[in-house]
A protein has these predicted regions:
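Aromatic-lined carbohydrate-binding/catalytic grooves of carbohydrate-active enzymes
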Residues: 330-467, 480
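C-terminal beta-sandwich/jelly-roll accessory domains of carbohydrate-active enzymes
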Residues: 676-742
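Short Pro-Gly-centered flexible turn/kink motifs
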Residues: 112-114, 122-127, 288-307, 732-739
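Glycine-rich, aromatic-flanked loop segments that form ligand/cofactor-binding clefts
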Residues: 103-123, 242-262, 304-329, 366-373, ...
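Polysaccharide-binding surfaces and accessory modules of carbohydrate-active proteins
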Residues: 28-35, 39-43, 51-52, 61-268, ...
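Carbohydrate-binding surface patches
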Residues: 48, 237, 247, 649-693
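Conserved, mostly hydrophobic/aromatic
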Residues: 48, 167, 293, 339, ...
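Active-site neighborhood of glycoside hydrolase catalytic domains
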Residues: 397-399, 431-433, 437-596, 606, ...
């Protein structure tokens, strides 16, 4: 085959793929931007937020304001360049630019850095024009001499005030260029001091640790270089002003990047005390080549503001995710109660055994039955078979149909585990196509979990994966896929491309992943998908736009999950957060907990069961059946309501408590947990939030009780101001309380 012709076809296909939108999601309810020609100021007013920017005398587009909503006639602008401080910091060098190129006298962190084939690395972006179309503002910045246009796109969600920003970088010159780094946006906070940063870190089985640090002169870098989102850092941040963090009050600016590949968010404070947050593609090993006429579009970087503290910042993000990010928006189905058979069987799955588990699950009230790893290919352990997505006829002699029919007959939907992006070297797929994995020719291929990463940037690999998944869904009546991803990248080569084009793999891979998910959803609209990556290593607003739920962690220990879920909900909605009840003692840490504690912990998200049901006693079955029935009466409130975090479990704190309130405020659900009893310290009084103060709420206990003298009914004001004292005693005690408006 002609190598040059092959490379040309691959380049054409890649260019077409990168021209597509990043992810399909419900359209946000956008506020209409405004432009004042006299002051040269652009303004977005949405929710309780105003965002404004203006063009200064030298053509720089500068941030003017981001904060609480202002009156429509309040003056903003004109923009002024930063004054000269010395010859080391000349005029304009530290201006609050919306999207700065690296060029001229700029010393602040640029949003875009490029180099040209003639050796030039100077890029000075100046305002050119704007358009407003269907609630979206597009501003064109241009370096006419270099032949580079950058189109900045802004949307503002009317309900939450959350702003979406992205950039399209186009080579309009006559020579190729290479993008060294490309951000989606730079957010400039109001001038001031005493800012503090929050972010999320973790590792496998220990995701979602909430970190806090003061912002001081210099830089803090949050990133993934791993090819995917990762659990090391998550592409989310929150910044407050005033030092102390509070759930209920205080200024908080926050943001999240909609990208499932390698990413970076950098927080800078410059010598003037100006705080900036710049985020987008990770520039590490980036080197993205643009020929004349080619363009690159960044992911969307969302940002918001509230004066209502960290709790309200989370609730705004949750509402935005539910209405504008997750598929189906307000019309999305509630997460069904799920059973997954992995803990019961691991790789030893077969038709008869799965049917027995299905019968047990259905008797508990489970609504979805999922067969995990081991149903396909020569898959008897994690050493072989991955990539061969055909039913193992030894385990399922008549295919999946008998099991699927059994599950449907038990009034449950049916799901399967898949890991399409990976392959075992010991597989038919790899033996046929060893060139399909990420690799550098003649170099060792590093394995993780005995598997390699397929190069989804290749159009033939993308086509193959869509074909086999489409065939699986077409031939079997499947309603759910648990889409896993169990390792990071290594040797990220793309030998089929020209050497100067190979680093496009980071962007093209993620675009093609999105395209597969999008096309599967379009062709099989009844199939729901969960994003899983050995737990929570692929959770971001990009993949969430194309999946219905996410798996926060492989750690299902009920006590550890309190901290995991607390960290997760800082940024992401419980509507997408799956949580399982598994065995005791925990396989993760050998900690024993009661079935009551395990159910109440898992009921704070989408409830699942992953224990070996064949080991449960009749008493266990009865307990589980009761909790499943109780959960169905409150899940709309838990999944679609507003979440209030009352007691934080972070840092191995002894207590945890949350309450959720339905949109109409007719129901509230309180969960309280005591990990460790402490001598002479009673469980704290819990004062609920979000209730209707004038309404009366009757109390019903799912589990646990209040101290003697607690009323059966009282006003919302009473429960929020006086509170409730729960009778929690001993280690790993818990309570679940429902408040119903009378």
């Amino acid at each position: 085959m002609n190598q040059h012709a092959t490379t040309a076809r691959l380049a054409f296909a890649l260019a077409a793929a990168l021209a597509m939108p990043l992810a399909a999601a419900p359209a946000p309810r956008s506020a209409t931007p405004r432009y004042d020609a006299a002051s040269h100021v652009f303004r977005l007013d949405a929710g309780k937020v105003t965002y404004a920017m203006g063009v200064d005398e030298d053509g720089r587009l500068q941030t003017l304001y981001w904060g609480a909503r202002l009156a429509g006639d309040d003056p903003l602008g004109p923009a002024m360049p930063a004054r000269e401080r010395s010859s080391f910091d000349p005029k304009g060098a530290l201006s609050r630019q919306e999207y700065a190129g690296w060029g001229g006298n700029i010393t602040a962190m640029p949003a875009l850095k490029v180099k040209f084939d003639d050796g030039n690395r100077d890029l000075v972006l100046r305002y050119d024009s704007y358009t407003i179309d269907h609630g979206a503002l597009a501003i064109v910045l241009r370096d006419k001499q270099a032949g580079v246009d950058v189109t900045l796109r802004y949307t503002a969600d009317e309900a939450t005030g959350i702003i979406g920003r992205s950039a399209r970088i186009e080579n309009k010159g006559k020579q190729p260029l290479t993008i060294d780094s490309a951000a989606a946006a730079t957010w400039s906070l109001p001038a001031g001091s005493d800012y503090s940063l929050r972010y999320l870190t973790g590792t496998w089985a220990g995701e979602w640790h909430l970190q806090t640090r003061a912002i001081t002169p210099g830089a803090t870098v949050l990133e993934s270089r791993r090819g995917s989102t990762s659990d090391e850092n998550n592409p989310w941040f929150a910044i407050n002003r005033g030092g102390a963090w509070d759930e209920a009050s205080g200024d908080v600016w926050f943001g999240a990047l909609a990208w499932s590949g390698s990413w970076r968010i950098r927080v800078d404070e410059d010598i003037l005390g100006q705080v900036r947050v710049t985020g987008g593609f990770n520039p590490f090993d980036f080197g993205y080549r643009l020929k004349p006429g080619e363009a690159l579009e960044t992911p969307v970087f969302y940002g918001g503001y509230t004066g209502g503290g960290m709790g309200e910042a989370s609730r705004l993000l949750h509402r935005f995710e539910k209405t504008a990010i997750l598929p189906h928006g307000d019309e999305a189905k509630l997460r069904p109660v799920l059973y997954n058979s992995w803990e019961a069987t691991e790789f030893k799955v077969d038709d008869a055994g799965q049917q027995r588990l299905a019968e047990k699950a259905a008797a508990l009230g489970v609504e979805r039955f999922v067969v995990d790893d081991g149903w396909f290919g020569a898959r008897n352990n994690d050493h072989a078979g991955l990539g061969d997505w055909t039913v193992n006829r030894t385990k399922f002699p008549n295919g999946l149909k008998p099991l699927i029919d059994k599950v449907h007959g038990l009034k449950m939907s049916f799901g399967l585990w898949v890991e399409p992006e990976m392959v075992n070297p010991d597989s038919d797929l790899y033996r046929a196509h060893p060139d399909w994995v990420l690799n550098f020719p003649d170099r060792q291929r590093s394995e993780g979990r005995n598997q390699l990463v397929l190069n989804l940037a290749r159009e033939d690999v993308k086509a193959h994966l869509f074909e086999v998944l489409d065939k699986l869904l077409t031939e079997n009546d499947i309603q759910f896929l648990k889409w896993d991803y169990n390792r990071n990248w290594s040797e990220p080569g793309w030998p089929q491309m020209a050497p100067d084009e190979q680093q496009k793999v980071y962007v093209a891979y993620t675009h093609n992943l999105y395209d597969i998910l999008r096309r599967l959803r379009e062709k099989h609209p009844g199939v729901e998908i969960e994003s899983c990556s050995g737990g929570g290593a692929r959770v971001d607003l990009g993949v969430m736009a194309l999946t219905d739920e996410v798996w926060p962690s492989d750690n299902t220990d009920a006590s550890d999950r309190l901290s995991i879920q607390d960290g997760f909900t800082q940024a992401y909605t419980p509507a997408a957060m799956m949580a399982w009840v598994t065995g005791s003692p925990s396989g993760m840490n050998q900690r024993p907990t009661t079935l009551d504690f395990r159910f109440l912990s898992a009921m704070q998200g989408g409830l699942g069961i992953g224990a070996n049901l064949l080991d449960w006693t009749a008493t266990d079955d009865a307990t589980a059946k009761r909790y499943v029935a109780e959960y169905k009466t409150i899940r709309a409130t838990v999944q679609r309501g507003d979440l209030y975090r009352l007691l934080s479990p972070q840092g191995r704190a002894p207590w945890s408590a949350t309450n959720s309130v339905s949109a109409d405020r007719r129901q509230a659900v309180l969960f309280a947990f005591q990990r460790q009893a402490e001598e002479a310290r009673a469980f704290p009084t819990l004062r609920l939030q979000g209730l209707d103060p004038a309404a009366r709420y009757r109390v019903r206990y799912i589990h646990g009780s209040a101290v003697p003298g607690t009323p059966d009914a009282a006003s919302g004001a009473y429960w929020m101001q006086h509170g409730i004292d729960l009778a929690l005693k001993g280690d790993f005690d818990a309570a679940g309380v429902v408040f119903e408006k009378r």
